[in-house]
Amino acid sequence: MTFDKYADVPHVDLLVNDISVTPQGHRLAGKSTVKVANNNAKPLDKIIFYLNPELTVTSVEMAGKNLPFRRDHQGIEVDQPIQQQEELTLTINYEGKISENICYTDVLTEDYLDTKVPQVFWRFGKRYAWLSNTFTLLTPECIWYPVTIAPVNPGAPYNVRKNFTDYTLTVHYEGDKTVLSQGKSKIDGSVITFTNTSALPGISLTIADYDKKALRVDSTDYEIYYFKGHDYFSKYFEPLSDTLPGVIREVKNSLEIEKDRDYPFGKFVLAETPVQFATYARNWKGYTEYVMPEILFVPERGISLGQDFEAERRRMNEWGRHGGPMDETEQNISLFNRFVSSLTSENSQNGWNPDNKLINKSNITPMLFGHTNYISSPEYPVIDIAVNNMMNTSSDQGFRFWGGIINDKQRANLYLESHSFETAIGDTELKPEIFYELLKLKSAALNNYITSQITQEDFNKFLKAFFTSRQFQNIPFDTLRYEIEKRFGIRLSDFIDTWYTASHTPTIYIKDVDANQIVLDEFTKYQIKFKVNNPSDIDAIISTEVMQGGGGGMRRGGGMSFE
């Protein structure tokens, strides 16, 4: 496979990509003027690019001269030496169709061929890209413009670098449909130009027969693009026209406080796609192709989001008969908040069992993390997604009665009893949902190691300042490790290798648990004591969570959880 062939070949960094495309029915003519840099430790005798294999490269030019090149499916070898730390500007001309077969080559065959959609009875088939007069949707997965880093590394999935590139897109389009991409758009006749103020990991192109609704709140533009005749939502939110800006502001502020990150883009877009548009949860990436910088692609009528506004309103009216009525404004605000929560939750429910969950493919919180930074480490390729997960996910370590059905978190714990994190990232048989739970456990362990020596608040403040000052950049892990040691005196090198390579977990014995109620100055406090023994050959970190619950019966009572 071509991706494997070039996986270990040194690659240049893509600094600038000025793209010009002309859609021509099922074909596309394009020109990319790119600036690349050799940040490797040695000179290179050739430059590697990737492009959809159905797009034919007609020429590669530099300073007005044609450069020799060879094509190997999606790979392009350009015979141009580049010295260490040297920057070069090249122009690549290409033309042709878009092959969807290049998409998701790392996904297991059984998942690739599975046409089921959770909680949806019908099967719609799968599409990964469109290029036609009626509809166009191109994402980085289909490599519709030249890049220097492959979208996947099948042999080592977590060893995929990320470029943050200054993109400009010019679309020459004679039709009457809406052209949508990242950045600020400028229309000059049949030429639409999109300019971005930040370096991005990738961009998309959509051309569709859309209607649009837009609202500006503070400094952010909120836009909804939906197929004509598909406005099923306005009647629920039009009564909120006066209060909606305040509701949106509150939701945005709440998300930023919860995630301790500011929304980094100037606009937020919901764009409807055909229901067949499919993507996959890949833990090494941390987000799906539904979630692009600035843009969330929503399958037709929001069918995969499980948001039926009319059914929700009927339930509210039914509940109102028992607990007091909600007026129309309260109902509409509740509908809006429920919809937003479906876009910010880590998991989506699959059936009635609360432990039977799927990774939420429409979770937009990676816009605050995965689209803004990348931590690179050849030794620990999983460190980027682990740190992002540590910052992005909420704690769910609380006490829960076990109903006799093993859940994915317990399966992850069982896996780690005899496997290392290093082994897990190469285990293609490990379900994504189990690996996600394993990733959360390992991310929590990394966080606990640090916060056993400093407060969580101090660590959160450090992380926010560290990543905000390096926004839209590739950051070497050594830089993060150095800054943590400089700021707090914590040596991650004393912990990280065992965290990554240990092939078993510690054995912890807990006994003599005793809880006492103490009244001090009319305040009731609790003192909890227990003994811990670790007879194993691996250090362990104990974290405790104290919960206060109700009375007897089968109701949830007080409890503790240990890690």
Q: Where on the chain are the PLM-derived regions?
A:
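Beta-strand-rich binding/interaction modules
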Residues: 56-62, 180, 517-563
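Acidic/His/Gly-enriched intrinsically disordered linker/tail segments
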Residues: 353-449, 453, 470-471
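Amphipathic alpha-helical substructures
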Residues: 429-512
